[in-house]
Amino acid sequence: NPKYALSCIKAAYDQGARWVILCDTNGGTLPHEVTQIVGEVTKVVPGKNLGIHAHNDTGNAVANSLAAVLSGVRQIQGTINGLGERCGNANLMSLIPTFFLKKDFSSKFEIGIKSKNIKNLTDCSRLLDEILNRKPNQHLPYVGAAAFSHKGGLHVSAVQKDPKTYEHINPEEVGNTRNIVVSDQSGKSNIISRLKSIKIDIQENDPKIKKLL
């Protein structure tokens, strides 16, 4: 009942509520719906007093939070590594660097986080998993061990020439590192990169590389 919900929201705000938090409790709302809902709510409560609490049941908690911000919301709730009931909550390890490093947000909003602290995000993510004795999700955006891993030979060659071809940010900005994987999909670039990472200097035309491939 949208009309009743809006009347409750307005009553709370009119009686002095500092924040009105919109909760996607069952996690089923989609980004375009969040945009529509926030658009209606901001007609009765200023965006500066609105927050969003998103669950990840459709895999859209981060996207819903970003949609809410672009529509006027100014408080975003989330958790480290997206931990939370059922499928989890909006992942702060994705939201924080997106707000800080992506111009669509950093150029419009005061984030209140120093760049030196952004570099602690990967350590923060992994520390929580260690405390919880929980296996880290290697595929987490920004902070996962695989977030900047490259396996295919063409990928590795391209990244070495221009990292932006396969990396949307410099991994060091969030305290992560690039990882070149050697596998049956590897090319010459993978082998050379891995050898150099362990301080073994080798020429590209060294016949030993062909044997390894």
Language-model segments: which ranges?
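Alpha/beta enzyme core
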Residues: N1-L50, L66-V73
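Glycine-rich phosphate-binding active-site loops on the catalytic face of alpha/beta enzymes
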Residues: L22-D24, S71-G88
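Short, ordered loop/turn segments at secondary-structure junctions
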Residues: D24-G27, H55-D57, I80-G82, P207
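Surface-exposed amphipathic alpha-helices with a cationic face
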Residues: V38-P46, I96, F100, D129
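A mid-to-C-terminal "edge-of-domain" accessory segment
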Residues: P97-F99, K103-L213
